[in-house]
């Protein structure tokens, strides 16, 4: 029985409700009165139910599609302006006991070189990331109780936060590790993590169990209920996502939105972020073995509808996607991207030898962080290295309240400009610096609150003189 407030996986992600929704969408997708009513609701920035969103996904009218794309861009700018948050993944270890058939880290893969970073190696990786200009990391590790216990993760977080190299500092560590206990989530909270991220992979229980034949991850309920335990452990900000291509896209699209609705209904705050990775090639993984690949046109539509259905959430796209695709996705609601990424263990300090194969997936966007920042500036996006909300305690429902009532721009715009200024001063190429300085000068006047605008101008001058780490 479907119950969005239940904490039982098969009740808040109810297979019969998903299938009923898919049937409803197929039946009513050509009802233009209904479709335009749904678009009007989205245009009022009220979000959409999973059933309403499914109707839009199923509707193949070109004019409706164009309205969806235009509206996604409008919604993104309403809540997040033209800011794009920058981050990088940091892979600590690829030791893993699970048998996920779509991931090269699976325990039976003998061709991959297993690696685990020591604390000194983590220090070197973090310095390399700081020297690029990064301030926000997404920490990644395989699931292995002996090689990657929670104590190793906690020690690594402490190490990362402790490193201050030149003007560099990692100010927010997000964590993407396997589902764990309420007590361990409390320990992660106490370690000062930002967002806890866990991808569902697929919401189809039968398919999930087939794709995860061995290891602790094979337990569908344990994995699917992880965000509930994280919330119960005091983690305010959680990030969800599916790996599109493992299941029919319509099924996982509906399941993903139901998960967001469940968190909002049960805890009063929905997902801080939604990620939309697509299955891609990796060592010992051939995408031809999976029949549910999502073509670009459908993928773009999925991203756009998620944006209008869950308008408050941050939406993330990684270097799995090419520069060309990422440019299109920025127009459809994406608000966070990675740049200069390495998906191998230890890949920031030393370029991996071809025979090592320690990467989780092959990246499609190989540009440096400076090239990505320059590209964003050329597209009139603000590359933001801001971590202020997390550090000021604006998390969970406090962040969402500010976001939904439109007050966040008095914080986010000046913070974005100040962190961009830091990047330009410390790390940017001359061409990027010139573009960025022109943007800061132009956009400072857009800070809505006069006092905040004056204070931001003062802080920008002080950054020019060598001071760092101002925030609203």
Task: Tell where the protein language model's regions lie, with residue ranges.
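Radical SAM enzyme core and accessory elements
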Residues: 1-37, 41, 327-335, 341-472
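An N-cap/entry alpha-helix motif that binds or orients negatively charged groups
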Residues: 40, 47-84
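Canonical Radical SAM [4Fe-4S] cluster-binding loop centered on the CxxxCxxC motif
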Residues: 80-121
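Generic structural signal for well-ordered alpha-helices
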Residues: 88, 126, 154-161, 185, ...
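Core AdoMet radical
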Residues: 107-124, 128-231, 236-240, 244-246, ...
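Conserved C-terminal portion of the radical SAM core fold
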Residues: 141, 195, 221-285, 295-324, ...
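Short glycine-enriched, charge-decorated loop/helix-capping segments at active-site entrances
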Residues: 211-217, 288-292, 358
């Amino acid at each position: 029985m479907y119950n969005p407030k239940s904490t039982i996986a098969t009740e808040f992600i109810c297979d019969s409700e998903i299938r009923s929704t898919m049937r409803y969408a197929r039946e009513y997708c050509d009802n233009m009165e209904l479709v335009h009513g749904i678009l009007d609701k989205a245009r009022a920035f009220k979000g959409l139910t999973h059933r309403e969103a499914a109707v839009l996904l199923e509707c193949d009218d070109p004019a409706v599609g164009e309205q969806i794309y235009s509206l996604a861009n409008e919604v993104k700018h309403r809540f997040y302006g033209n800011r794009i948050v920058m981050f990088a993944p940091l892979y600590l270890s690829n030791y893993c006991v699970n048998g996920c058939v779509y991931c090269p880290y699976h325990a039976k893969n003998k061709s991959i070189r297993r690696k685990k970073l020591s604390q000194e190696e983590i220090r070197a990786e973090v310095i390399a990331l700081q020297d690029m200009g990064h301030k926000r990391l997404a920490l990644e590790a395989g699931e292995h109780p002996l090689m990657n216990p929670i104590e190793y993760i906690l020690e690594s977080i402490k190490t990362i936060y402790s490193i201050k190299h030149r003007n560099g500092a990692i100010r927010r560590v997000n964590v993407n590790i396997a589902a764990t206990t309420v007590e361990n989530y409390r320990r992660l909270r106490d370690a000062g993590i930002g967002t806890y991220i866990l991808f569902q992979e697929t919401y189809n229980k039968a398919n999930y169990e087939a794709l995860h034949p061995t290891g602790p991850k094979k337990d569908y309920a344990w994995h699917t209920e992880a965000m509930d335990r994280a919330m119960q452990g005091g983690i305010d900000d959680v990030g969800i996502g599916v790996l599109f291509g493992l299941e029919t896209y319509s099924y996982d699209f509906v399941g993903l939105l139901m998960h967001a609705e469940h968190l909002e209904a049960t805890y009063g705050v929905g997902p801080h972020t939604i990620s939309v990775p697509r299955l891609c090639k990796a060592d010992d993984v051939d995408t031809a073995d999976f029949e549910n690949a999502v073509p670009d046109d459908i993928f773009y539509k999925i991203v756009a509808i998620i944006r209008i259905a869950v308008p408050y959430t941050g939406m993330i796209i990684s270097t799995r996607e090419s520069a060309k695709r990422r440019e299109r996705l920025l127009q459809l609601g994406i608000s966070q991207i990675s740049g200069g990424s390495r998906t191998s263990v230890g890949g920031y300090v030393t370029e991996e030898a071809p025979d090592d194969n320690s990467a989780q997936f092959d990246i499609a966007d190989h540009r440096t962080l400076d090239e990505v920042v320059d590209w964003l500036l050329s597209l009139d996006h603000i590359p933001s290295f801001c971590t202020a909300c997390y550090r000021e305690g604006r998390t969970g429902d406090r962040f969402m309240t500010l976001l939904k009532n439109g007050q966040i721009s008095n914080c986010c715009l000046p913070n974005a400009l100040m962190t961009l200024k830091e990047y330009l001063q410390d790390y940017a190429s001359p061409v990027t610096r010139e573009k960025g300085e022109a943007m800061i000068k132009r956009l400072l006047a857009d800070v809505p609150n006069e006092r905040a605008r004056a204070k931001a101008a003062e802080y920008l001058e002080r950054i020019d003189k060598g001071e760092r780490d101002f925030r609203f």
